[in-house]
């Protein structure tokens, strides 16, 4: 069988296809199969597999691995244009860097001595130290409270709004008043904090100062300003603001306006609010909760008035001073002058404007001061009226 097979293979030069070779190999014995493949010029490589050591089913091709290794050795590194001009830094002189000593821990007795000296100085001026009893409460920061309020006044001057920005706008003062009346209703509907309302109007004025806004986009700017200002634990979703505008704007438009406002303000939203200074003035004056709440209401009345845009912390001091119209025992003491940084003569014109504004809002204020709902409804328009007014200016 071997002789006959070899004679046939040697006598013919045939071109076998792969399927034919496989078929012939299967029909031959192992010895004849090896001889048959040699005649065809095929190199048979059998990868041996260990029983226990090698558990992979992939046969390693030593020839391909050697070829790849040879290619890697021949391949050289070429410098790019960016690195060809670099010089070696080996051997250059490097100056030693001085070690920075960590500061020594501060002696708390020195801090206490400094606070006592400060208290003694202001007492000699006839000013009460309103922070002397707050040293045990770390949340009140009595050691730094004066520096904090100085920095807040610096921020107040840095982000001050121009008083003539409305002259460069298509909108008018009346449109701004209508928008703020509507925002007050939205603020009440969503049960937001009072700081949110003041911050909303502040963001609105600062954006209108630097951007040209059309009538059709005014409500969008207002509602987006409240969305940014409502940084609270419980806040309204964007869909709620879309609904409150009667679907006049979409979620995408509100998000786009949010980006525009933040870029225009350079993400600086930390301008102090007048309500922050009111707390300081109320503490310096030792006023009760009734006068403090009345002062906050007077400040709310000024939100819709464009003529009060130029005032910042003066509004808080003037609002507190305005309560003297209902309480003649209220005095503007040296402590109030020191902590508010305003004298009674400086606040006089602002107090007169607030008095006129209060009389316009409430013809007989003494009969309604204790009724918060009547006060709010008499000043601000209802939700339906505000919505109709806004639709009329679009």
UniProtKB/Swiss-Prot annotation:
PROSITE patterns: CYCLINS. The keyword S-adenosyl-L-methionine does not apply. One of its GO terms (biological process) is cell division. Essential for the control of the cell cycle at the G2/M (mitosis) transition. This is G2/mitotic-specific cyclin-B. Interacts with the CDK1 protein kinase to form a serine/threonine kinase holoenzyme complex also known as maturation promoting factor (MPF). The cyclin subunit imparts substrate specificity to the complex. SUPFAM superfamilies: Cyclin-like. Coiled coil: none annotated. It comes from Patiria pectinifera (Starfish). Residues 360-394 are annotated as: Disordered. Residues 379-394 have a biased composition (Polar residues).
């Amino acid at each position: 069988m071997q002789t006959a097979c070899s004679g046939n293979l040697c006598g013919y030069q045939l071109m076998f296809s792969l399927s034919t070779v496989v078929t012939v190999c299967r029909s031959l014995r192992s010895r004849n199969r090896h001889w048959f493949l040699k005649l065809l010029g095929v190199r048979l490589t059998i990868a041996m597999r260990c029983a226990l050591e090698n558990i992979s089913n992939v046969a390693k091709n030593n020839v391909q691995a050697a070829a790849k290794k040879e290619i890697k050795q021949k391949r050289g590194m070429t410098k790019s244009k960016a690195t060809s001009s670099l010089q070696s830094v080996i051997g250059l002189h490097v100056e030693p860097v001085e070690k920075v000593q960590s500061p020594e821990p501060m002696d708390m007795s020195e801090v206490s001595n400094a606070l006592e000296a400060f208290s003694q100085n202001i007492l000699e001026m006839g000013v009460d130290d309103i922070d002397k009893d707050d040293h045990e409460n770390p949340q009140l920061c009595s050691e730094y409270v004066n520096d904090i309020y100085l920095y807040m006044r610096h921020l107040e001057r840095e982000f001050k709004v121009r008083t003539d920005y409305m002259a460069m706008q298509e909108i008018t003062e009346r449109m701004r008043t209508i928008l703020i009346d509507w925002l007050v209703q939205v603020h009440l509907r969503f049960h937001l904090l009072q700081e949110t309302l003041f911050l909303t109007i502040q963001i609105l004025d600062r954006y209108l100062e630097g951007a040209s806004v059309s009538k059709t986009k005014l409500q969008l700017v207002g509602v987006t300003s409240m969305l940014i200002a409502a940084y609270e634990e419980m806040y309204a979703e964007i869909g709620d603001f879309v609904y409150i505008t009667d679907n006049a704007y979409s979620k995408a438009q509100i998000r786009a306006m949010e980006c525009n406002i933040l870029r225009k303000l350079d993400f600086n939203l930390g301008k102090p609010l007048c309500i922050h200074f009111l707390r300081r003035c109320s503490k310096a004056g030792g006023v009760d909760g009734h006068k403090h709440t009345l002062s906050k209401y007077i400040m709310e009345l000024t939100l819709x008035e464009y003529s009060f845009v130029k005032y910042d912390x003066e509004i808080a001091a003037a609002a507190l001073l305005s309560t003297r119209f209902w309480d003649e025992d209220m005095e503007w003491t040296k402590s109030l002058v020191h902590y508010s940084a305003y004298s009674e003569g400086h606040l006089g014109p602002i107090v007169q404007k607030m008095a006129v504004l209060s009389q316009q809002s409430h013809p007989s204020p003494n009969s309604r001061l204790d009724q918060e709902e009547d006060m709010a409804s008499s000043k601000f328009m209802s939700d339906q009226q505000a919505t109709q007014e806004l639709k009329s200016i679009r």
